[in-house]
Design a protein with these regions (language model features):
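Cofactor-/ligand-binding subdomain signature composed of acidic, glycine-rich
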Residues: 1-41, 62, 70-72
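Cofactor-binding active-site loop characterized by glycine-rich and histidine/acidic residues
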Residues: 33, 39-201
Length: 202
């Protein structure tokens, strides 16, 4: 699957965005049918969020990190972090880490994450990858984590000892992106996170 182009706005890139959005919508529709017919476990899907997530994907660069929620499948498809095949492997709880790299079938569907370690236990070069912190189920809980991720970038800019840690940060220039739903934006965690990011200047 091709990924969404970051800065190119030609006919082909717009059509590619449309294709990704269309595939994501139909993955949601098919996934819901599979759940309602009893062929797959509990399902949560991202239909209706496609356009906003395609826009976010165009702004997202290597080294950036996502702290999101369970409706972000279009974004994950657009950045090549997930695919329709991996999405359905997760829906069916496939225990194969190659088929379902987010959690090897241990999480509910729509719970995405990228691996920060190689198979041998060494760190992956996060500055060269599109990163996603692992999603958790309590809605709104991605926001306090977003505070930590954004504050870490500030520390990488300002603390000399951290500048020597290669591979984790591009001198604090990465951006932490957060996504949240309407209901969760009314929770205390959301407002406390907004306040904390302001106080910490993160």
């Amino acid at each position: 699957m091709k990924t969404a182009a970051a800065e190119v706005w030609d006919r082909d890139s717009v059509l590619e965005d449309y294709r990704i959005g269309w595939e994501s919508r139909h993955a949601s529709l098919l996934g819901r049918k599979e759940v309602l017919s009893g062929k797959a476990k509990f399902g949560i899907f991202g239909d209706g969020k496609e356009v906003a997530q395609l826009a976010m994907a165009r702004a997202f660069r290597k080294g950036d990190v996502r702290s999101g929620y369970y409706r972000d499948q279009t974004f994950m498809f657009a950045k090549g972090i997930s695919s329709v095949e991996k999405f359905f492997a997760q829906l069916y709880a496939t225990p194969d880490v190659d088929a379902e790299p987010s959690s090897a079938g241990r999480s509910m569907n729509g719970h995405f994450g990228t691996r920060f370690l190689n198979d041998d236990g060494s760190w992956r070069p996060l500055v060269d990858e599109f990163n996603s912190s692992a999603d958790v189920s309590p809605t709104g809980s991605q926001m306090p984590r977003l505070v930590g991720l954004s504050y870490a970038s500030r520390l990488y800019r300002e603390v000399d000892a951290m500048k020597e840690l290669a591979g984790f940060s591009a001198h604090g220039s990465e951006i932490a992106f957060g996504t949240i739903g309407n209901a969760s934006a009314a929770e205390g965690m959301f407002w406390e996170s907004v306040n904390a990011i302001g106080v910490l200047r993160a």
